[in-house]
Amino acid sequence: VKSTQKRGFVVSRPVAWKPPGLTGYLNMFNDGLSYMGVVESVTLPKLTRKLEKYRGGGMPGSVSIDLGLDDDALSLEWTLGGLPDIELWAQYASPGADSVPLRFTGSYQRDDTGAISAVEVVMRGRHKEYDGGENKQGESGTTKISTECTYYQLTIDGKEVIEIDVINMVMKVDGVDRLAEHRKAIGL
């Protein structure tokens, strides 16, 4: 149900149901290097907000005050089959908070029409953890990489949906930079 507001009241009208897009294929790029056939799974950042409850005098309930991104809002986990290549190991303890460029690409297919959507998430950050897991003779094993990102850009079918740049104080949602006035107010 889609809602619109008229004279202070919310009016609901039915919206045609669409089945979810299912992941068709995915790939991960690390500093331009493709991990096709090697990457097994990707857990993209959750984009969580840090909210604090506030209840002032005369308020019958509390409201959530938005304090920006949660500390783990831009955390990424990705799993590779086998032992990672030297290029990935060389990024361990990278000196810059945004020194590792990553790119996730995925294709999602709708079940009703068969239409395919291209999804791209561009991220920059530094690796926090390399988890080699358990290794057994005769098995390929996996390595899980945890990356703390400072930059995140979500694009769906060529349209930028979200861009977050922690270092440069940018937060664009559907083309609107929600921090532009704050940057202006502090002289940036």
Where are these regions (language model features)?
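N-terminal interaction modules that seed assembly of large macromolecular complexes
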Residues: 45-73
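Oligomerization/assembly interface segments of phage tail-like spikes and tubes
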Residues: 64-84, 139-152
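Polar/acidic, low-complexity leader/linker segments enriched in S/T/G and N/D
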Residues: 2-53, 181-188
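Mixed-charge, glycine-accented linear interaction segment located at domain edges/termini
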Residues: 126-188
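Catalytic micro-motifs at enzyme active sites that drive phosphoryl/nucleotidyl and oxygen chemistry
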Residues: 64, 90-92, 109, 130-137
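Short acidic (Asp/Glu) patches
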Residues: 56-62, 87, 123-134
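Beta-strand elements of well-folded, non-transmembrane domains
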Residues: 80-84, 106-112, 125-129, 149-154
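Short, acidic/charged, Gly/Pro-enriched secondary-structure junctions
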Residues: 91-121
